Amino acid sequence: MGSSDSSSGSAPPRHQPPPPQQGSAPELPPGFRFHPTDEELVVHYLKKKAAKVPLPVTIITEVDLYKFDPWELPEKATFGEQEWYFFSPRDRKYPNGARPNRAATSGYWKATGTDKPILASGCGREKVGVKKALVFYRGKPPKGLKTNWIMHEYRLTDASSSATTSRPPPVTGGSRSASLRLDDWVLCRIYKKINKAAAGDQQRSMECEDSVEDAVTAYPLYATAGMTGAGAHGSNYDSLLHHQDSHEDNFLDGLLTAEDAGLSAGPTSLSHLAAAARASPAPTKQFLAPSSSTPFNWLDASTVGILPQARNFPGFNRSRNVGNMSLSSTADMAVDNGGGNAINTMPPFMNHLPMQDGTYHQQHVILGAPLAPEATAAATSAFQHPVQISGVNWNP
C-alpha cells in the first residue's frame, strides 16, 4: 500500500487580507467626516508616515502638489468635500540652500503670515510640528495674480525630522533630484476660500429682487384695499348725512303734527311734543353761534315759520321783585308778530317755571330742542316780559 501524501492532511494556509491599496476610497460609515485638529494631523498621521509606520486607513493620498495646479487636486484626493488632505514631498529651490521650491504648473505658492507652532496636549506641551499658510498666485513672481486657493502645510520640527525624515545625501555623482529633496513628506490641507463680500452682495441682490417682486405682487391688493377703504369712508359719510336728515325730518314732522292738532289739550300736547323731540336721536354735530338776545342758539331759521302761536289764557299774572327792579308778566301782553294783528299772551301753565334764564327754559320746554339765532330772535319776542323800574318816567 502506498503511503498517503502527508500534505493532504495538512490545513490549507489562511488567506491574509491584502493591504489597502494606494488611492482606494476608505470605507467609513455614513455621517463620518474627516476633520482632524492640527495636533492630530501631526502626531497621528505625519509622524507615522515619516517613520514608515502603516496607517490604519488610507485616507490621505500621496501626491506631489507642486506638479499640479490647486484646482486639479480635488480629483486626485480619495476623500474630502470642501477640503482635501495630501502627503507631498518638498524639494529645495537651490541645491545648497534650505528654501523650498514653491513653483507649480501655472503659478506659485506664496507663504503668508508667520509659522504657527503645534504643541502636543498634556503637561509638557511639547512642540511637535509647525504650520505654515500659503496662497496660490497665477503667473510668475513677483507679479502673480492672487487666487482664493489656500494651503496649510504641516511639517515636523527639526528634532523630529532628523530622526524621521530623509536628508539629502551629499552630492557625489548621484542624481540631481535626490540632491534637491528637502523633506520626504509634509502633510498639506488644500481648500478654496469663499469670498464673503461677494457672497454677501449676491445674497443682498437676491433679497432685493425678492422684495421688488413682493412689492409688485402686493400692489394690486393695496390698490384694491385703498379703493375699498375710500368707498367705506364715502358710505360712512353718506350714512351720516342720511342720519342727520332723518333726525331733522322726525323733528319737523313732530312740530307739524302738533300744529295740526291745534294744541287743544294745552300742557298735555306740549309735553308729548317735547317727549317726541327728546326721543329722536341727537344730532351728530351742534354748532354754537353767539347772539345778543339769548346766550344759546342752536336751530336753523327754517323752523321759525312753523312754530305754533301762543294762545290767550285769561287770568295769568305773575311778578317778581329783583333788587330795585320789578319784573312782571301779565296775560294781556302784546306780542309783535311781524306786522300781524294777532295778540299772543303767556299761557297760565308757565307759572310753575322759574324765572331765571326764562327765555332759555321756555325754549326747551315749548320746543323741546335748542334754537338758532334767527329762531330765538323771533321766539324771544313772544315771551318778552315788561320791566318796570321805579323812578323812571317811560312816557314822553
Swiss-Prot record:
Q: What happens when the gene is disrupted?
A: No visible phenotype.
Provide any one GO MF term from the record: DNA binding
Question: Which ranges does the entry annotate as DNA-binding region?
Answer: 128-199
Query: In which tissues does this protein get expressed?
Result: Highest expression in flag leaves. Expressed in green spikes, peduncles and stamens.
Q: Where is the NAC domain?
A: 28-193
Q: Name one GO cellular component term.
A: nucleus
Q: Which SUPFAM superfamilies match?
A: NAC domain
Per the record, where are the segments of Low complexity compositional bias?
1-13
Pfam families tied to this protein: NAM (PF02365)
Q: Where is this region: Disordered?
A: 1-33
- Per its UniProt record, what PANTHER family does this chain match? NAC TRANSCRIPTION FACTOR 56, NAC TRANSCRIPTION FACTOR NAM-2
Free-text domain note:
The NAC domain includes a DNA-binding domain and a dimerization domain.
State its role: Transcription factor of the NAC family associated with the grain protein content (GPC). Accelerates senescence and increases nutrient remobilization from leaves to developing grains. The tetraploid cultivated wheat (T.durum) contains one additional gene coding for a functional protein (NAM-A1) and one extra pseudogene (NAM-B1). Plays a weaker role in terminal senescence than NAM-A1.
Further remark? High grain protein content (GPC) is a desirable trait in breadmaking and pasta wheat varieties because of its positive effects on quality and nutritional value while Low GPC is a desirable trait for barley malt and beer production.
How is this protein named in the record?
A: NAC transcription factor NAM-B2
